[in-house]
């Protein structure tokens, strides 16, 4: 954990074959929208407002004959882990908005015993959950310095617990 941002971008699409940072040194970002897929855990610390949803990528590729072609990749959606990976998504001074990036209704999915922590820190920072947040059997914690607005399911099963903490209003719609 340092004072420098690791990634600054309008939109960020992450895909890792193992873990994405760790609990001691999170991946520090300043981005507007985000999607992540990891075979292990995901640890992200956002500097300001962030929307989780869908990100598509188009790049210019230079071929062996120095020609340039545009390559587009299908959109990646949401934040998902496998192999019992946890999801830790926090902002230091901004609101977090969780939206479904595809049509499955789920925005955050921690596999197996993976835990979920989503925390909007800083004065006036809200957490808005517009799509389902889930863990197989892990714990799910949602926190905001100001309001927490829930308009979707938050689920776990078996030994997992759910915790929602709002410094301001707690609203459940639907």
Each predicted region: which residue ranges?
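Extracellular lectin-like interaction modules
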Residues: 1-174
């Amino acid at each position: 954990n340092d004072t420098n941002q690791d990634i600054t971008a309008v939109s960020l699409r992450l895909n890792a074959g193992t873990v994405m940072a760790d609990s001691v040194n999170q991946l520090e970002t300043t981005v507007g929208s985000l999607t992540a897929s990891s075979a292990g855990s995901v640890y992200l610390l956002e500097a300001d407002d962030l929307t989780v949803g869908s990100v598509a990528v188009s790049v210019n590729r230079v071929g062996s004959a120095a020609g340039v072609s545009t390559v587009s990749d299908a959109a990646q959606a949401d934040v998902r882990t496998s192999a019992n990976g946890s999801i830790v998504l926090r902002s230091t001074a901004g609101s977090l908005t969780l939206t479904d990036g595809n049509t499955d209704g789920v925005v955050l999915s921690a596999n197996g015993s993976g835990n979920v922590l989503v925390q909007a820190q800083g004065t006036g920072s809200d957490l808005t959950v517009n799509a389902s947040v889930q863990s197989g059997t892990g714990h799910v914690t949602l926190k905001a310095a100001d309001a927490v607005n829930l308009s979707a399911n938050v689920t776990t099963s078996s030994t997992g617990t759910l915790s929602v903490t709002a410094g301001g209003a707690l609203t459940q719609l639907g």
